[in-house]
Amino acid sequence: MSYLRFDKTLMTNLEDSLPKEVLRSNRSGAYSCSTIVDCNTRKYHGLLVVPVPELDQENHVLLSSLDATVIQHGAEFNLGLHKYSGDNFSPRGHKYIREFDSLKVPTTIYRVGGVVLKKEQMFQHFEDRIIIRYT
């Protein structure tokens, strides 16, 4: 099995990073899907998308995204990235990404000032749950 790892050069270039997606699914049909820079560019993207048979036969986005903000010495650094009409992006959190690795657990490494932050997204296989851990 092969795993993907991308460095800062690719991650900060949106033309290269936005077409690359990560998809994790579980046994109940739930999934988590987005681009490698966590920018939802498609209708089916979301951190937690689950089928709700009580409503209909469709998947429903329960959690679209989660944007972290690092506050260091009174300054705010938004790590999120959203695309709006006309190819406008805000905030531009991808500029803090240093590395993305999909080895077992999708992991993104950020560097904000003198702080290095690791984000891991663990998708549960037997429950409709996503766990996001920052260290």
Segments from the language model and where they lie:
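Terminal accessory carbohydrate-recognition/targeting modules of carbohydrate-active enzymes
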Residues: 1-135
